[in-house]
């Protein structure tokens, strides 16, 4: 899979831009604040209809314009697939093969991407919400039904929280409704939990040998999905019963606080090196090796799930890695994955992958191919 071309209209600082790309490595070179990251963000938006930088759609639209628009030609399984995404003040519209998609969940998955940006180095050390967003993004593009389930979960969670808030304020409401909402909540929660736990298991299978190699055989990586339920066995019905029992035991606490205290929105993923929790005890080098291992594992996992390698976006991350990790990253993708790199300079990075890359110079919203 690769992105053959992209067209941007009124997106960020690009009023009218058309680019054609190499199916191997493309480097966007330029000083800071010139628009390099905006280009990678456009590719990410074209793939996922979401950004790694903001959730406010207005941020994408050029000042005093009505809408931003992205078009791309994706080559997958030997076929060219046109993608279109328009962003207005009222929301997004998406097309695949020039056909309007009723839901964004039907659009996502036509272009698979893995992004590695400086903020991804906090995937290991950062707040649990960062890891939950990571799971939602990665599972969602491989299994679009996951996005539908996630949307349903968020809808029921919001309803349940509103009801708990009314109970907290001692308003007159039907006492049976909480039990009905809890049952609905548990059904969707276990669906998400199962998909996340399965993903983490597969991710570890790829990430562990990569981490072992990068650490020169000194470290063993384990990844655990820390769920609100006890993940004994593979029976979702048992998980659901455990969740319902837990929710019954904390019902009064939830009413007192007016919020749902358990579920996938409170779950986390934990990383262990040689049995030690990396979040709490890992060095900065170990945290970066773990993040790099996870990102490289994503590439192989998406290939396993979809039959094609994703597009890799490296947003100013090479400067955050030492020479050894740089070399391992570039060596792992060489000749295998279409890659987009943003950087202020390639000097000091001695690797054939960049030497053979197609280079674009970015300055004040203009892009010139070398």
From Swiss-Prot:
Q: Which GO terms describe its molecular function?
A: ATP binding; single-stranded DNA binding
So where does ATP get bound?
A: 30-37
Give the GO cellular component terms, alphabetically: cytoplasm
What does the UniProt entry say about where the protein is found?
A: Cytoplasm
Function, as annotated, reads:
The RecF protein is involved in DNA metabolism; it is required for DNA replication and normal SOS inducibility. RecF binds preferentially to single-stranded, linear DNA. It also seems to bind ATP.
Q: Which UniProt keywords apply?
A: ATP-binding, Cytoplasm, DNA damage, DNA repair, DNA replication, DNA-binding, Nucleotide-binding, SOS response
What is the protein's species of origin?
Listeria welshimeri serovar 6b (strain ATCC 35897 / DSM 20650 / CCUG 15529 / CIP 8149 / NCTC 11857 / SLCC 5334 / V8)
Gene Ontology terms describing biological process: DNA replication; DNA synthesis involved in DNA repair; double-strand break repair; SOS response
Q: Which Gene3D superfamilies match?
A: P-loop containing nucleotide triphosphate hydrolases (3.40.50.300), RecF/RecN/SMC, N-terminal domain (1.20.1050.90)
> Which InterPro entries does this entry report, sorted A to Z?
DNA-binding_RecF (IPR001238), DNA-binding_RecF_CS (IPR018078), P-loop_NTPase (IPR027417), RecF/RecN/SMC_N (IPR003395), RecF_2 (IPR042174)
Q: Which Pfam family, just one, is annotated for this protein?
A: SMC_N
Name the principal localization, coarsely classed.
cytoplasm
- Protein name stated in the entry: DNA replication and repair protein RecF
> Which family does the entry's similarity section mention?
Belongs to the RecF family.
Q: Does the keyword DNA repair apply?
A: yes
């Amino acid at each position: 899979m690769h992105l053959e071309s992209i067209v941007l209209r009124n997106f960020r600082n690009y009023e009218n831009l058309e680019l054609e790309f190499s199916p191997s490595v493309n480097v966007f070179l330029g000083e800071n604040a010139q628009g390099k990251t905006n280009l990678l963000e456009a590719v990410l938006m074209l793939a996922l209809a979401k950004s790694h930088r903001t959730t406010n759609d207005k941020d994408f639209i050029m000042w005093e314009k009505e809408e931003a628009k992205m078009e791309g030609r994706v080559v997958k399984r030997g076929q060219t697939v046109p993608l279109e995404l328009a962003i207005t003040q009222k929301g997004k519209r998406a097309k695949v093969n020039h056909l309007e998609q009723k839901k964004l969940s039907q659009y996502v998955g036509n272009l698979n991407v893995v992004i590695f940006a400086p903020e991804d180095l906090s995937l290991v050390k950062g707040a649990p919400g960062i890891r939950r967003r990571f799971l939602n993004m990665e599972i969602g593009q491989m299994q679009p039904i996951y996005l539908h389930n996630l949307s349903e979960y968020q809808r029921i969670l919001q309803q349940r929280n509103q009801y708990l808030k009314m109970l907290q304020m001692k308003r007159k409401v039907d006492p049976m409704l909480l039990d009905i909402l809890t049952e609905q909540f548990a059904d969707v929660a276990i669906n998400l939990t199962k998909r996340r736990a399965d993903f983490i298991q597969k991710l570890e299978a790829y990430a562990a040998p990569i981490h072992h190699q990068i650490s020169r055989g000194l470290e063993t990586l384990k990844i655990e999905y820390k769920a609100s339920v006890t993940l004994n066995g593979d029976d979702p019905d048992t998980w659901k019963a455990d969740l319902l029992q837990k929710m019954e035991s904390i019902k009064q606490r939830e009413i007192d606080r007016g919020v749902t205290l358990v579920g996938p929105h409170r779950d986390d993923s934990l990383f262990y090196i040689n049995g030690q929790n990396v979040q709490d005890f890992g060095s900065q080098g170990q945290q970066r090796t773990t993040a790099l291992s996870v990102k490289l594992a994503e590439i192989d996992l998406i290939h396993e799930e979809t039959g094609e390698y994703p597009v890799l976006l490296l947003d100013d991350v090479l400067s955050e890695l030492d020479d050894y990790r740089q070399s391992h990253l570039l060596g792992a993708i060489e000749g295998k994955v279409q890659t987009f790199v943003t950087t202020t300079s390639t000097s000091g990075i001695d690797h054939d992958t960049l030497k053979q890359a197609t280079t674009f110079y970015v300055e004040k919203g203009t892009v010139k191919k070398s």
